[in-house]
């Protein structure tokens, strides 16, 4: 699933292509998404057709496309979703579900093979429950003191804590594994026991995310930016997907364990419990 760096990469590559553009028409595939209640074609048409895009931004793992009218569209990429821009004449990929036809014969396309993503039009996107429920953004809305307080109030395992979007917005499995390794914190450490390392952990989270953004995201299979280019961050991963390989910081081996169906990668020498 695209995490904060991947979503930020999509946003940054969308902006120069669609901001200032007007939407001429809208097309939908007619196929249902798994979150079908979100894809209200009538509401999308009413909100989007004739609208001028004035901003594209990220909130957690969500993409918000703002219109000059104050309304907009909220997009979640789910597991395999993509937002790309292409010429009208270019053949559409299989599993294209929504197309916004722009001026200058360009199209903004939402593609999602597994259909876990969704698109929702809203008169006030920032007031949607999904957005209001998000915790602070770790890059722009968090400091050591605030993280310390959040950690102190939780007995959940630190990895579970960091994945909770109500506590911090945007982190996912890849970048949590990487950040915990950088902070030298075992993934099963209870959150409140890590509060003394709040500043170190915040620095590790921010460094991990900034590297991911600089490398345009992590692409194992599906992720591409709005131009169709894959990310390069896989080359910068320290522990994620490196089970059995030698730790880059010591002579130990990277290990994998499974919690709640998710693989967790860590070094038991560097990250002692």
Task: Identify the residue ranges that each predicted region occupies.
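Structured catalytic/nucleic-acid-binding cores of DNA maintenance enzymes
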Residues: 1-273
């Amino acid at each position: 699933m695209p995490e904060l760096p991947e979503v930020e990469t999509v946003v940054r590559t969308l902006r120069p292509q669609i901001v200032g553009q007007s939407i001429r028409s809208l097309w939908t595939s007619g196929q249902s998404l798994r979150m079908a209640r979100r894809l209200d074609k009538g509401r999308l048409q009413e909100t989007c057709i004739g609208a001028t895009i004035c901003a594209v931004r990220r909130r957690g793992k969500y993409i918000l496309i703002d219109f000059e009218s104050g309304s907009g569209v909220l997009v979640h990429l789910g597991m395999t979703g993509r937002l790309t821009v292409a010429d009208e004449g270019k053949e559409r990929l299989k599993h294209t579900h929504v197309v916004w036809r722009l001026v200058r014969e360009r199209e903004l396309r939402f593609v999602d093979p597994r259909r876990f993503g969704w698109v929702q039009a809203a008169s006030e996107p920032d007031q949607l429950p999904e957005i209001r429920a998000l915790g602070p953004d770790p890059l722009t809305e968090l400091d050591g003191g605030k993280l310390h307080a959040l950690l102190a109030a939780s007995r959940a395992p630190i990895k579970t804590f960091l994945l909770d979007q109500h506590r911090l917005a945007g982190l996912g499995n890849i970048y949590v594994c990487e950040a915990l390794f950088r902070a030298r914190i075992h993934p099963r450490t209870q959150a409140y026991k890590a509060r003394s390392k709040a500043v170190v952990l915040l620095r590790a989270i921010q460094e991990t995310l900034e590297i991911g953004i600089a490398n345009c995201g992590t692409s194992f299979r599906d992720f591409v930016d709005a131009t169709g280019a894959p990310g390069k961050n896989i080359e910068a991963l320290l522990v994620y997907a490196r089970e059995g390989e030698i730790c880059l910081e010591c002579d130990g081996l990277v290990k994998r364990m499974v919690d709640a169906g998710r693989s967790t990668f860590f070094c038991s020498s560097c990250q002692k419990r």
